[in-house]
Amino acid sequence: MAAKLEVREAMLTEKRVCRFCLTEQKLASIFEENPRVKTTANLPLQIMAITAIEVYAGDGMPGHICLECRLLFEHCYRFKQMCKRAETLLRQYPLTGNWPSPLEKPRAPMTMVASKKLLVVPAKTAEPSETPKKLLNTMAKSSSQVIIEDVQVLESAMVTPRTVAGSSPVPRRSHAYELKVDNNQELSMDDVQSMLEDMASELEKEFPDIPQKASPVKPKVLNKSSIRILNKGPAAPVEPRLATPKVKRDDSGNVAIVTEVLDSDLPLDDQDDPTKNAEKVATDVFPCPDCERSFPLQQLLEIHRLNHTRSRSFQCLLCEKSFFSKYDLAKHNFVHTGERPFKCAICSKAFTRKALLHRHERTHTDVPKFICVYCEKPFLSRQEMEKHAERHQKKRPFQCGVCTKSFAFKQGLERHETVHSTNLPFPCQHCERSFSTASKLARHLVAHAGKRAYPCKYCHKSYMLSHHLSRHLRTHTQTSDASFVCSECKVSYSNYNDLLDHALIHATASLKCPMCRKQIEDIDSVESHMDQHKQSERHACEFCDHIFLTQKCLQRHIEDDHVVEMEPYQNEFEDDGEGEGGVDEKEEHLDDFEDMDNVKQEEFVTEYLEDDALYEDHLDDSDESFTPPPPKQRKTNPPKDAQQSVRQTRSRDAQRITQKTGKNEGKPHHKLERNLKNRRSAK
């Protein structure tokens, strides 16, 4: 059985079939860029954004896509970008007062390949010059999404010469007007319309002008249903694709349009419909129907969807933005005040959120850590460690009767006792555990989700959720094959230097760089500033078209201008945090989940769903609970003061180092501490 499975998996990988419609014609690789197709983003990213399906080389699936699906993905992606752009402009209107101008809609995809023919055959008529031109122009104006294959316009050789009053006899002619298109050449609707109009002009030159009065009777359309099919617009729920449309006339001059509708668009019987008889299979990707996100477990998706029905009841007094919780609103207020209350103890760099500070502190790998004697948690500064130690020294008279935890307040004990209850409102579907809040359940579900299912193909990072990967992939495409868009006028360029040359025009006019929004002192400094963009590394924003000179400038821009966009990534699966320090711990774990590699699965906190203000567990138990350590491993008597805690930490660290490397190896640790003190005193 295992051998058959391996054989089938190998056949699936090598099968030359379109991964999305299962056709075997006109295939191309998903992972190789087609130079004839101008795209707004690479194809795997478009597929992820539209279908929530991640494709990458070596994923065990067919690696091909047909031409029609390729164009449809490009069209859908452009449409999605247009919708998001419209949403942004509409939300900016209350703040700016500038009503946005209409956006340009993406053109419908059109493919033309040379295999079949479109025949326009005029029969006997008194006006051989008028009918072909009218028919072609009508088709050029009305056809919206017709797959035309190798167009030929033929004049019948059986035209009978007739003499019309005031004109010369029409000679007998036998000409063929043929327009061939190379295989797999992509043409837009404008190209097709122009092509048909040119063909009509050629026909007009071949025939002399005939007075209008010579044709009092207009030809009758015999099959109006075919006309309706040709003219069917994009608003139709299911638009049939047409192959080989033919325009014919009978002996009386009446017009008939004969079309062949592709079999895949005809109504199917239930027994022939693959979707009716398809067996449902389990999948590890559960896309949200209300947004572009997807999740590895169905229950995570259900928790996420709760936020689509929640109301934003906390409104900012300085602008019109609203938030789910007081904590979100407090974070947003930093944008207006400019306050950055969380400072690094090593380099004094300031941040608006403690989670960003914790992420930054991990970069100081060469600085000795101060270890808490109670829980062995490391800190970069003695002050932080002493403040943390005070929490362990609190009197906690309220002890749980089931476990060893104790609490400083009775309310904390009552909240904790719900943990031991077997009738909690949020049960896990994969085990017998249940939880008091949806956020705690979501964090527990990470253990069931297994490994991170979405690895990046360009670097070593991997992600638990598809939209985390999608957001990360934009950082690669901004510096590779993606088009570069001017933030001022939205003109796009395929080359970064071309964009900079264009941006120089805007910067000269306004003395403000359109790339990084920096105000330039004078016109003489404009060119030198743009040269810095050419020579320095590019730090592209994931949410807009700005590109900055340094990572610091980019981070400041995101914190100031994209607070709303960052909310879905910062707040999912998070408790309200209105209690004493509860949010800080969760934010720190969230950063580990999204940015760190090779971390134990139990330490992950899944991506935020928005603050869990729906539920009442506002305090984290770790803030006021304390579990006495086992007597063999830790000291049961707490130190009398914080200074004694520091001395014990130093002594214990020195003993550890001595045991591992020798008696004299403990000295460098204290030497680093002295260097750290000198650095602080110098500052």
Curated annotation (Swiss-Prot):
Record Pfam families: zf-AD, zf-C2H2
Biased composition (Acidic residues): 610-624
A Gene Ontology BP annotation from the UniProt entry: regulation of transcription by RNA polymerase II
Membrane-spanning segments: none
Keyword list, A-Z: Chromatin regulator, Chromosome, Disulfide bond, DNA-binding, Metal-binding, Nucleus, Repeat, Transcription, Transcription regulation, Zinc, Zinc-finger
Protein location: Nucleus; Chromosome
GO molecular function: chromatin binding; chromatin insulator sequence binding; DNA binding; DNA-binding transcription factor activity; RNA polymerase II cis-regulatory region sequence-specific DNA binding; sequence-specific DNA binding; zinc ion binding
SUPFAM superfamilies reported in the protein's UniProt record: beta-beta-alpha zinc fingers, Glucocorticoid receptor-like (DNA-binding domain)
Role according to the record: Insulator DNA-binding protein. Chromatin insulators are regulatory elements that establish independent domains of transcriptional activity within eukaryotic genomes. Insulators are proposed to structure the chromatin fiber into independent domains of differing transcriptional potential by promoting the formation of distinct chromatin loops to form topologically associating domains (TADs). Recruits Cp190 and cooperatively binds to chromatin promoter and insulator regions to exert transcriptional regulator and chromatin insulator functions.
Note: A pita/spdk mutant was first identified in a P-element insertion screen for mutants with a mitotic phenotype. The highly condensed mitotic chromosomes characteristic of the mutant resembled the pieces of fruit in the British dessert known as spotted-dick, after which this protein was originally named.
Protein name, per record: Zinc finger protein pita
Organism listed in the record: Drosophila melanogaster
